[in-house]
Amino acid sequence: MSTKVTLFGQARERVRSALAAMGSGDPAPYIDCWAVSEDATLFGAWGPIEKGHDRLVETFRWVGGRFKSGALVPEDVVAFESGDLAYTVGFEHGEVVVDKGAPAPMTIRVTHIYRRIDGEWCLIHRHADFPPADQRGRSLRPDRGKRQGCRFSCR
């Protein structure tokens, strides 16, 4: 990693910038957000389940190669840190070109887990998927101000 990221907020901003690059086909900044660790894990939205830094790098390069001319923008519903672990839960939204197709909107549900290693916040796990329909017939929608501290309400 080139710049040491010692604050969790800085790590989140670094991931935000890296996802914008990933959506345009450049996986390198996102790869740089990850811990070089054999216990780093990925449960990817397009199917890959990987363990170990080298396997993740290979997969992120494959994912980046599928994107062109877009950006992914994270929307954290929850961000929390305690001690040397932290996590975010939310979505990534964007209009992207995948596999040389037409620009199309994309939304992914994402959980990131961060670990502070030698004073630096690094990603250690990502679990992402395409949100399925709520089988109860409800949809997740913005509902600002309805309940203090809650941005979403299921209806």
Segments from the language model and where they lie:
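A beta-strand edge to alpha-helix "cap/lid" segment located at domain peripheries
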Residues: 2-35, 39-155
